[in-house]
Amino acid sequence: MSGADLDNKLILGVCLGDCIHVAGLTKFLRIARQFGYQTQFIGAAVPPPVIIEKIKNSPAKIIALSYRLTPKVGLSLIKQFIHSIRHEKVIGRDYYLGCLPELAISTSKLDFFKKIFTGGEPMDEFYTIFQLESLNHTESPYPADLISRIKSKYPYPVIRAHFGLPSLDATFEGITEIAESKVLDIISIAPDQAAQEWFHHPDIIRKKPSGSGGVPIRTTEHLNALYKRSQTGNYPLLRIYSGTQDLIKNAELFHSSLHNAWAAIPIFWYSQLDGRGPLPIKNAIQDHFSAISWYALRNIPIEVNDPHQWGLRHATDQMVVADAYLSARIAKDLGVKWYIEQLMFNTPLGTSFNMDFARVLAMIDIVFPLIDENFTVFKETRTGLAYLATDPTVAKGQIAASTLFQLSVQPDIVHVVSYSEASHAATPNDVINSCKIVNTLIQDGVNNLPNYSFDKAIIKRKNELLEQAQEILEAFEVHGTHMGYENPYLSPECLSSAVRSGLFDAPQLKGFPGAKGEILTEIIDGKCVAVSSNGYEIDEEQRIRDLNIVEQMYSEENFRKQVLLND
């Protein structure tokens, strides 16, 4: 059959010789079908002459062979097969082999197979075969922006991980090592604390500690070098922390040097509220609004990394859900078109899997009504920062367990938290191995997991959270109306007042400027709830009433008016 008659979207699969191990081959064919290919499985333990005849009579462009027995015997069979292919002039095909690592070393020297698989390859190895064959290759065959990358990997999520070591040289080398491993799609550069706050102030930054919490980026050349080091392997996108001041200057610099894949900007945080920024809450919010608007004008995706910060400080589950809506609403009102909703699982520490999952579902549901043709939401999941143990063996299991639940919400982005997170800054090897764990789960489970959202206990809790989160939002809106704001979501004064008054509050905020820090919370039956000084759970309506900030919302007169309206 001539090359012109071959079907580029048809794959012929077969186990060679006496090999009966079909698991790896059938997985290869299954993944191919998910990318839109047609597949034909000839069978197991098929002699080379029979395979040759099947190939000659098939229009398949891609031929997938598997041999997972004794390498010495396999090498002899493969040499016989290659000789027959060349003798019979079965040309114009692409041949792939799955085998044991020892045999892969020998067969790679034969210069015949387009790709040899030994098991455990990252998803991008399959993507390279199945997705890129029909594309016009540029210098990088991988999409260079987040939206295209997400679409090209569907139904699989793209993978993101943090990386940044106290040494510039080690970070440069690590970026290249991670890129060449092809285990992820986005590397989030973690700059040190001095770079986040003082990059544009050289007289100050030179006096600050170097390498505290990340890589000591000090010049534009450092940023350019980071990008250059990433342009290999599967050409991962880069992104970086937005900083704690000079956000617009940072945005312009990161866009030009790193081609920043998306920006992560909070509403309340990275300010005096948590001690990680120099500005009072109100001023920080205004700066955050300006930065979000800058990115929105350029159609650069935005992640508002705010809700999980409340959860990490043991705010109630419903407060985290309310902030999920508030964050998305602000982004939409500021003109963001591509919005990334971060969903941190296992937060706060101590919540049960099912109640934690209910919170995540509530966060998704409360944002859903905002979606329209001008506002697209991508779901980004991650393992809880406080969830991981210092023992790496335990932490690996925790990553796997958390990821299984994450896949149940069909994320567009999976943020891989390295298993070393609780003990030390992730090395390239830590990042690569953590991503391998997650990639394996994704390959095995992306379309084959039970739907936990139908669990009755989860549904009940999700609905409770939606109702209580709505009470917080209604209180916030009424509070804003009393302050004279038509849209309180875009008022830094109203937002900072909501924290100052305790409407948004967390136990671990006590003592921080601009926060109340008086709420008491406990983990009860796997849920993070507000409690009285006696340890009894308080519902959200009672908590808000006790704050005395929106009294008329709960007054008898207002209640009677609402009854009359409903009648």
Whereabouts are the PLM-identified features?
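Glycine-rich phosphate/diphosphate-binding loops that line cofactor/substrate pockets in enzymes
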Residues: 1-8, 52-59, 149-153
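ATP-dependent carboxylate/acyl-activation modules
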Residues: 2-42
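Cofactor-cradling patches in redox/metallo enzymes
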Residues: 29, 34-116
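Surface-exposed amphipathic alpha-helices with a cationic face
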Residues: 33, 78-90, 222-233, 290-296, ...
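Catalytic alpha/beta active-site cores
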Residues: 45, 49, 69-72, 93-96, ...
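C-terminal helical cap(s) of enzyme catalytic domains, especially alpha/beta-barrels
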Residues: 128-136, 198-208, 279, 356, ...
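Long alpha-helical, hydrophobic tracts
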Residues: 278-282, 299-433
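Catalytic-core signal marking the mid-to-C-terminal active-site face
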Residues: 430-567
